[in-house]
Amino acid sequence: MSMLVVFLLLWGVTWGPVTEAAIFYETQPSLWAESESLLKPLANVTLTCQAHLETPDFQLFKNGVAQEPVHLDSPAIKHQFLLTGDTQGRYRCRSGLSTGWTQLSKLLELTGPKSLPAPWLSMAPVSWITPGLKTTAVCRGVLRGVTFLLRREGDHEFLEVPEAQEDVEATFPVHQPGNYSCSYRTDGEGALSEPSATVTIEELAAPPPPVLMHHGESSQVLHPGNKVTLTCVAPLSGVDFQLRRGEKELLVPRSSTSPDRIFFHLNAVALGDGGHYTCRYRLHDNQNGWSGDSAPVELILSDETLPAPEFSPEPESGRALRLRCLAPLEGARFALVREDRGGRRVHRFQSPAGTEALFELHNISVADSANYSCVYVDLKPPFGGSAPSERLELHVDGPPPRPQLRATWSGAVLAGRDAVLRCEGPIPDVTFELLREGETKAVKTVRTPGAAANLELIFVGPQHAGNYRCRYRSWVPHTFESELSDPVELLVAES
């Protein structure tokens, strides 16, 4: 195949030749407080750090600052820290691993003597209710032996459970939508703790849609006989999945590595198998209640029996390009194909009424550098497809646009809390990095398929105060690195 050579000397742009299942073990330790007397719950307090595996090493953190680590003579499953002096503060702990330390425990906050710290409220497995689903509210406190209470906004009564002697959390069934919070008390007549943050429960007539994905060869222009794998992911585990094309269920081989997803295997696609595929799921306890359909995934097949289309670029004003694909057939389905070091895949689809499809690329940057071509397929039997057009190479020089960094809080962050900074850029599927002013090594790195990421500083202390910037980078299919964002200042307050 010949290569069309075109040079676009605008804005530095040049056209030229060209499953195995994973097993995970929970290691995060648990941290709770115990008091000599629940009548004076914040006097003579002992913090217990419990690991998942026996270890001789434990460490406590207070207000974001590490305390002296403890090394025991023999491994233990837990260790108790006796608090002395001013016990008010925010605590976390970690336990030893053969290769270092575990992640930090969840936050435990001890307030002043006149109030009990708020518990945490979460919903399991999801924050919605629907027929056939058993949703529960989990209220996690600070002290053992307390009584937990759940409240729905607008209700006058609490849903109360007995004392949680052996744990610091309680579970409540949730049957109604609304805004929920929970509290606890240390004795039957005692004052309530501060309420937890509010969690909203929605009532849905049907479960929300899953996500259907295809990767690798499945996202290319397919040929008869190719194998395709489609992955359907639900927002919860233990459901029944279904693959559909249009309104027809497809009974195809399937496999799974996790209870929240399924792999559908199309082992030998044929002409006519192109088009839109969706998936859905239903709960085991509601066999008639299917979720909404996923967003469709489109497959395109070509036997390359039809003539190749004509493919040409048309520069537009600004950082934009229009790619024209012309076929000798009306009413065809067109596909713009991108090829780079990451592989060859369909970039976009169009179904124009005539014989010409116009694909527009806006805000072009170095991330758009690739080889492009187009194909078309006949939507009528026998569903023939074209050979690919001549390839065009787009080469863009220069760094990509700078990202923006913003804080998700206002004012100062309390020592011992988490600080979340959001870095936003124009290019998806990149790695975001957070850097402290004057340092070259990233303090936080997040890989994301999107064009933005939350960069979280866990359990900040005075040592974390300062200015931060972010950037994004990529190694595949192209190696590039953005400039640093404008700075955002992190202030840390003790109280």
Curated annotation (Swiss-Prot):
Q: Which domain of life is it from?
A: Eukaryota
One Gene Ontology cellular component:
extracellular exosome
User: Which GO biological process entries does UniProt record here?
Assistant: immune response-regulating signaling pathway
Signal sequence bounds: 1-21
Keyword Cell membrane in the entry? The reply is no
UniProt keywords (A-Z) are: Disulfide bond, Glycoprotein, Immunoglobulin domain, Repeat, Secreted, Signal
- Where, by tissue, is this protein expressed? Plasma.
Q: Which residues form the Ig-like V-type domain?
A: 22-113, 114-206, 207-299, 300-397, 398-495
Bridged cysteine pairs (disulfide): C49-C93, C139-C182, C232-C279, C325-C374, C423-C470
Show the InterPro entries listed in the entry. Answer: A1B_glyco/leuk_Ig-like_rcpt, Ig-like_dom, Ig-like_dom_sf, Ig-like_fold, Ig-like_Receptors_ImmuneReg, Ig_sub, Ig_sub2
Is the keyword Transport assigned to this protein? Answer: no
Query: Which SUPFAM superfamilies does the record cross-reference, listed alphabetically?
Result: Immunoglobulin
User: Where mainly found?
Assistant: secreted
Q: How does it assemble?
A: Interacts with CRISP3.
PANTHER family in alphabetical order: MHC CLASS I NK CELL RECEPTOR (PTHR11738), OSTEOCLAST-ASSOCIATED IMMUNOGLOBULIN-LIKE RECEPTOR (PTHR11738:SF186)
Q: Could you tell me what this protein is called?
A: Alpha-1B-glycoprotein
